[in-house]
Regions:
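Interhelical loop and helix-boundary elements at the membrane-water interface
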Residues: 1-80, 85-146
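Juxtamembrane boundary at the C-terminal end of a transmembrane helix
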Residues: 152-159
Length: 159
């Protein structure tokens, strides 16, 4: 339990429970993770569509390009910086940018892994579940390796 004075000139005591602080940080962390991942996926998609020429892994996922991966990295770094300034100043900017870069790389690895698993199972697309997004698995593939990262980062960052 943290205590102090909300307005030192009037000596109004306040109490802020650790549960409230923990809940706020958890909300900020989840928001950060989802905004960075969505920014990465969106940036990669639109940059790859507009500028994509060099295939990233043509045998696994022929639609993914190095240009798209670079666009995803730029978008994830931008979302990390915006998240830091908008609502998550508790996470230092260098840590936010480093975490976003790692999340982007893990997102691409998760995407390629999911594509390889689908190719191995001869299930090219599951778009009927979530039309317009390439299917449910295509929306969740970047979470494949980022979910454990979120867990361990939250576990060790605020120790």
């Amino acid at each position: 339990m943290r205590t102090g004075f909300a307005n030192p000139s009037r000596f109004e005591p306040y109490l802020v429970s650790d549960a409230y602080v923990s809940h706020t940080l958890s909300t900020h962390m989840l928001s950060f993770f989802f905004l960075v991942l969505m920014g990465s996926d969106t940036g990669a998609y639109y940059t790859g569509r507009a500028l994509g020429r060099h295939k990233l892994a043509p045998s696994v996922s022929p639609g993914k390009t190095w240009e798209g991966a670079a666009g995803g990295m730029a978008a994830s770094l931008a979302m990390a910086a915006l998240s830091h300034y908008w609502f998550f100043p508790e996470l230092a900017l260098p840590a936010a940018l480093g975490l976003a870069a790692l999340m982007n790389v893990l997102g691409v690895v998760g995407d390629l892994t999911e594509s390889a698993l689908k190719r191995g199972a001869n299930a090219k697309d599951a778009a009927q579940i979530l039309p317009g997004h390439g299917g449910l698995f295509d929306r969740l593939d970047s979470l494949l390796f980022n979910a454990p990262l979120l867990y361990y980062f939250a576990l060790y960052y605020w120790r």
